[in-house]
């Protein structure tokens, strides 16, 4: 289309000037759009402290990892200290599943996740509690993940009937045990009574009072030692902390001041090599991987098995969050069987699981039995 000058006597250069003016107008008029598009990806207004994020988080499918496989050339579950003929060559899949959590979203970003994906939008406080921050939650999740690894090993050893012992993981500075008990000591007895797991020590200390003396039998690098400790009073900040590993009996009760972990007593060591994963929900699958590697045959029965669930040291399987997203991730990864904690079964039944079989489990023993029965074509308890 051609444009004419309003004045027939205008010089030939007039239309050119008008065209430049229009170009400038269009360019300047586009600036708000460009700025708006740029702001969509910003969490604060440039040059200010104005926060553009919304108090919501998006939860969706996370990656899955085969606990029988390798990551970057390293076994996800690495077992050492065992004879080669005891370590079973495993194959197949026992995949742990994860949930991807996205925070610090702007309103357009949140709406985009909600409209264009299968993510679930939840209040931010369900992911990052009030009076906390992302860094604190990350530390807590890392600690929970480490705890799940320890529990997975203990539960697997119990299932396999292998002996356990209690190792000192840390000694609180200034605690009654400080200077007497050392990191890596193995506590073998309390006042002459044999102990095998941290709970045995905690129970024995809990029966005493501040000021009492306790005699600990200790294996220190293969050398048998006896140490006597005068118990103190539990600090207020530990009162009611049911997850603390320290040997305590409640506020005002006897306090030793050591953090303990159970480990195999026959020299077996289990190392878990997944990085940047948090939370306790991998416990069941880690424990199954240890059982599978230390027993003949394949728990998967040649199928692609995935699952989730926390694990306690006694083998109890607990519920987790994001079950529908984990089922979806497993289905998309090609799994044919998914292990579901009993506490998640009703929610799992509503998920789009495709042709996957959802096995309901509440203990490690039960999970092993369910996989064995399913492989044989026997009836098993399923969700839904």
List each language-model region with its residue ranges:
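Terminal targeting segments of Actinobacterial cell-envelope proteins
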Residues: 1-24, 115-124
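Conserved PDZ fold ligand-binding element
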Residues: 177-200, 204, 219, 327-330, ...
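PDZ-domain C-terminal substructure recognizer with occasional recognition of PDZ-binding tails
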Residues: 203-252, 350-374, 379-384
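Short, glycine/polar-rich helix-capping loops at beta-to-alpha or helix-loop-helix junctions
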Residues: 340-351
């Amino acid at each position: 289309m051609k444009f004419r000058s309003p004045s027939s006597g205008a010089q030939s250069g007039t239309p050119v000037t008008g065209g430049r003016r229009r170009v400038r107008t269009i360019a300047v008029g586009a600036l708000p759009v460009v700025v708006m598009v740029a702001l969509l990806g910003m969490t604060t207004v440039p040059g200010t402290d104005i926060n553009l994020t919304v108090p919501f988080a998006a939860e969706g499918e996370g990656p899955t990892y085969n606990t029988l496989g390798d990551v970057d050339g390293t076994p996800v579950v690495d077992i050492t200290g065992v004879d080669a003929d005891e370590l079973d060559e495993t194959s197949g899949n026992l995949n742990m599943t994860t949930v991807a959590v996205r925070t610090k979203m702007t309103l357009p970003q949140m709406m985009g996740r909600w409209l264009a994906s299968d993510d679930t939008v939840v209040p931010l406080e369900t992911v990052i509690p009030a009076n906390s921050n992302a860094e604190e939650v990350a530390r807590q999740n890392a600690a929970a993940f480490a705890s799940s690894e320890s529990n997975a090993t203990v539960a697997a050893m119990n299932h396999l009937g292998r002996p356990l012992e209690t190792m000192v993981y840390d000694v609180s500075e200034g605690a009654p045990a400080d200077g007497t008990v050392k990191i890596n000591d193995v506590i073998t007895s309390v006042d002459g009574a044999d102990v095998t797991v941290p709970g045995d020590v905690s129970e024995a200390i809990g029966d005493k009072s501040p000021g009492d003396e306790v005699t600990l039998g200790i294996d220190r690098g293969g050398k048998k030692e006896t140490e006597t400790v005068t118990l103190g009073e539990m600090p207020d900040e530990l009162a009611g902390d049911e997850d603390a590993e320290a040997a305590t009996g409640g506020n005002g009760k006897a306090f030793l001041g050591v953090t303990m972990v159970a480990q195999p007593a026959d020299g077996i060591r289990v190392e878990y090599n997944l990085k940047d994963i948090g939370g306790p929900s991998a416990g069941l699958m880690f424990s199954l991987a240890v059982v599978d590697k230390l027993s003949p045959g394949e728990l998967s029965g040649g199928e692609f098995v995935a699952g989730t669930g926390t694990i306690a040291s006694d083998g109890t399987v607990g519920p987790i969050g994001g079950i529908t997203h984990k089922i979806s991730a497993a289905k998309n990864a090609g799994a044919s069987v998914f292990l579901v904690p009993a506490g998640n079964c009703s929610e799992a039944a509503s998920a789009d699981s495709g042709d996957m079989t959802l096995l309901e489990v509440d203990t490690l023993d039960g999970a092993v039995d369910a996989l064995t029965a399913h492989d044989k074509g026997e009836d098993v308890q399923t969700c839904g």
